[in-house]
């Protein structure tokens, strides 16, 4: 089943799934569990939502989303439990997130980058997966200024 996560305990379940996934990829989360709770319940109460996919009572996929300007839903984190990949929980999650965006009458659903190594390489598999939902890619401009420090 697909559910909006309402409690801190549910957010912890999501965070656990996220950490397992990141560890498998050799990555670390930008945010701690405490950060996510602070962001959701203190700083961006209306702008951040969490969603999960459950098999019975076990969360097998989840997402943290940002709602921008009443027109955009952006997935900040998407994660699933690798043990349940044969059930396609990520597909199920994204389908229902898109449904939520439609119900909220939002204009755009974005689900982030498809690059690795700070944008140096395109992850073709991830790109194809996202394009499978009828999405189109867009390029994000990046600006930098080199500073000469003595």
Give the ranges of each region predicted by the language model.
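Conserved acetyl-CoA-binding loop-helix of GNAT-fold acetyltransferases
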Residues: 85-101
């Amino acid at each position: 089943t697909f559910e909006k996560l309402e409690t801190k305990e549910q957010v912890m379940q999501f965070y656990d799934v996220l950490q397992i996934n990141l560890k498998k990829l050799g990555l670390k989360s930008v945010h701690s569990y405490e950060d996510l709770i602070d962001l959701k319940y203190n700083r961006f109460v209306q702008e951040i939502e969490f969603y999960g996919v459950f098999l019975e009572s076990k969360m097998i996929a989840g997402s943290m989303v940002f709602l921008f300007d009443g027109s955009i839903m952006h997935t900040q984190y998407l994660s699933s439990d690798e043990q349940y990949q044969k059930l396609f929980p990520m597909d199920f999650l994204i389908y229902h997130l898109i449904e939520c965006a439609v119900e909220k009458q939002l204009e755009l659903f974005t689900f982030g980058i498809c690059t690795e190594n700070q944008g140096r390489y395109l992850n073709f598999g991830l790109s194809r997966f996202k394009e499978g939902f009828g999405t189109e890619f867009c390029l994000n401009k990046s600006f930098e200024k080199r500073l000469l420090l003595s």
